[in-house]
Swiss-Prot record:
Record-annotated disulphide pairs: none
GO cellular component annotations of the record: cytosol
Taxonomic lineage from the root: Bacteria, Pseudomonadati, Pseudomonadota, Gammaproteobacteria, Enterobacterales
Protein name (Swiss-Prot/TrEMBL): 3-deoxy-manno-octulosonate cytidylyltransferase
Alphabetically ordered keywords of this record: Cytoplasm, Lipopolysaccharide biosynthesis, Nucleotidyltransferase, Transferase
Catalytic activity line of the entry: 3-deoxy-alpha-D-manno-oct-2-ulosonate + CTP = CMP-3-deoxy-beta-D-manno-octulosonate + diphosphate
Cell compartments where the protein resides: Cytoplasm
Organism per entry: Serratia proteamaculans (strain 568)
Keyword Metal-binding: no
Amino acid sequence: MSFIAIIPARYASTRLPGKPLADIHGKPMVVHVMERARESGASRVIVATDHPAVAEAVKAAGGEVCMTRADHNSGTERLAEVIEHYGFADDEIIVNVQGDEPLIPPVIVRQVAENLAGSQAGMATLAVPIESAEEAFNPNAVKVVMDAQGYALYFSRATIPWDRERFAQSKESIGDSLLRHIGIYAYRAGFVRRYVTWAPSQLEQIELLEQLRVLWYGEKIHVAVAKAMPTVGVDTQEDLQRVRDSIKG
């Protein structure tokens, strides 16, 4: 099965300026991500960036770059620009690999592409079991519930499904029904072309979750439990140091 990995690498970052170029043992972070994407078996890996310094670093490592505008509101919009630039066919499978996840397991990059290929959805993503009460009730941990066929019913920052009987007794025992959504997506190129024509939805604006736009307009999102536990992305200097320590170890 063939798929293309696209890595949006926006230079500006409020908490960690120049994040894609952050050094991790002699290599920019974006190059680590690119190498992980290659290990997934992607037929092509493209870094989409708005900054020439990022482009130069990727090219120096033998990577492919697509320069994009700096005014995109989301990674999906940046993805759409790349799709139009290359003129990818509507049925081409594209995996959006976050540019700030240098430890992403290659197996889940391939998994989400394969899941999309085997489904009727225009988009696929992954989730992992929630194992702690702290995470279960943390609004920064996005929860997802699916139907019997593995298609998303809803994504929320709230604790869903709400286990009424269990939580009435104690919120320390959360059971095994909760799943946390992780931010890796596969799309068919034609779906991305449609997506960027839709106006933002009310639910998306309330929850601040872009994927709710898809459900609002009646489209399907395939969701499966990830084969490997993803790592936390790099948003701060502390996150960056943890990644450096992990790779060194």
